[in-house]
Amino acid sequence: MFNAGRYQELENWTRLLLERCPKSGFSWKVLGVTLQAQGKDALTALQKAAEFLPEDAQAHYNFGVALQHLGHHDRAVASYRRALEIKADYVEAHCNLGVALKELGHLDEAVTSYRRALEIIPDLATVHSNLGNALKDLGQLDDSVVSCLRALEINPDSAEAHNNLGITLMALGQLDNAVASYCRALEIDPDYAEAHNNLGITLRALGQLDNAVASYRRALEIRPDDTDTLISLGVALQDLGQLDNALTCFRRALEISPDFLKAYSNLLFLHNYKIAHPAATLLEEKRRYGNLAARQARPYTEWHNVAESEKCLRVGLVSGDLRNHPVGFFVEGVLAALASNYSGRLEFIAYPTHSCVDTLTERIKACCHGWHSAVGIPDENLARRIREDGIDILIDLSGHTALNRLPLFAWKPAPVQASWLGYFATTGVAAMDYLIADPWTVPESEDIYFTERVWRLPETRLCFTPPEVEIDVLPAPSLSNGCVTFGCFNNLTKINETVVALWAQVLQAVPRSRLFLKAKQLQEASERQRLLELFASHGIHGDQLLLEGSAPRADYLAAYQRVDIALDPFPFPGGTTSVECLWMGVPVLTLEGNSFLSRQGVGIMNNAGLPDWIAADTNDYLAKAIAHASDLPRLATLRSGLRDQVLTSPLFDAPRFARHFEAALRGMWAQWCNQQQGEPSMCTMVSKNGSSFGR
């Protein structure tokens, strides 16, 4: 009857049998698979089958499948393992055990299960594909490619295998090859929503924003309520400056899944681009996020860490950006200095949330005592791992940026937790003890807008690693062409209409001047046209504008040789771009804002020794732009010595920054140790080098 599809009839028959023999394991087993075939709840029947047939491997396997479909992966693992105790060569059990283990974040064990299945039957395409996926999450990208290609040798028409290969190729930075893999998957299965979404993600990385948006919209036609795709679409629209449309996507994702913290993070990050948002309002938004994260966590209140203030501290780093990324550029030199000068005092253990491994990743990894992929590991499991690793201080390097794991911090896996570097506002997470800042970006009067205690490093929260590429600082271009070239290489989303209006006044006030803009969005003809029209509405025509798309880092840095003065956008100023600009000998005119983020330029320029390049308001910004552009000899002199000036400044002095940073970590740890010994926690503590914190 089962093979004939007569499921209802078979169900009725087995129920009659069970009325007569309620302990018949075989009848419960038949009923369970029959209910499964009809899409009905089969859990109880399959559980009873496993109970009454304790030595039946298939009964335990079937129960595991039912548990797995309901998301009970831990219980499914137990059932599969029982099946394998009975029948060690049960291939399906090995395969599904691998899937369940991967869902739980036990990637090494998942790989072992997949490999065991392949030892028994080597030509299982799906298992090779799943193995490749798990290896990708572990950061073993070359091995992942091998597994995906093996899956495709066995089954060239596996859309899933092509999709998985594309994901790994993207992590390797082979974007064009990744696009080809996704396109092949979509040739096989045009309605493969995940492949459309992944294609969009890769196209966005290539700067093809319009095509990326089209891919996301196609994915949403297939699966309208897919929250991950809604986030992807929102981020691409944000890149295109369509902030209201992006906001709609993030809010729609939250309507579908009110507890979707990733959507909430994207919504909060978007606010950074908007001018009119009072600090108190943003704080309340962040608190709501923090409350939601707290409701999803069961925070630890006890740890096994020894409360000794001078012990060697185990410091955990959670980030998706320990690679060729601005965070990587800042953290590399700092970690190298800390590893060199504080060996035996500090140990760094990284928990990367991204599979990408590049040359910068390898250099950062060399500074760490441990490296454990956090990709695909649920917060609860990762929190347990971090606690078991004995991490004393856990540092978030992402805030509400992409690939963050802020919800993890709500579990409080370490006794001391801090946010630093990758973000520029409060996280809103109550379990985050500290936010590392400096006196320029967060004056003491602003402490009330943070859920964390603000710990101020004495000079700067940023220390940049000089680029490895050898690029000379050339004489100011205005000396040879007779016109001042202003420039901005920031993300184009930062350049709002208020910024354009002010820059238009600058161009109108400085004769024969022009503006050089370089950003990934400018690879799109539609974006170039939009920007030309926006400037035209403020009286600036195309012959005063030079628009270029993104470029490899060496070419991007060399482009500064064509810029005399950099103009900082607002309220979201440059960070990495500003420091790189200074390294290339180009001063940056920045506007002082009223928030942590909008004062980032203030901190950079003061630490660079250029306070006269900080404008108090838009009128001062215009006046300073005119004044600096009118004194070309002074500008040329400044340019010739600026690289040497900043290389000896706090912005590039890694050993100096490392001293301040180690003292800050030691101070945070001392506070916790004091609390464990029953001593009152001080409201303000000043270390011997001047680091301080307050509420």
Task: Identify the residue ranges that each predicted region occupies.
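Hinge/capping helix and adjacent helix->loop/strand transition within the periplasmic-binding protein
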Residues: 502-509
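Glycosyltransferase donor-sugar binding loop
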Residues: 350-356, 514-529
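Substrate-binding clefts and catalytic carboxylate motifs of secreted carbohydrate-active enzymes
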Residues: 487-498
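Alpha-helical solenoid repeat scaffolds of the TPR/TPR-like class and their adjacent stem/linker regions
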Residues: 1-483, 501, 532-541, 546, ...
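Short coil/turn segments
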Residues: 491-492, 592-594
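Short hydrophobic "strand-cap" motifs at the C-terminus of beta-strands
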Residues: 318, 489-490, 518, 548
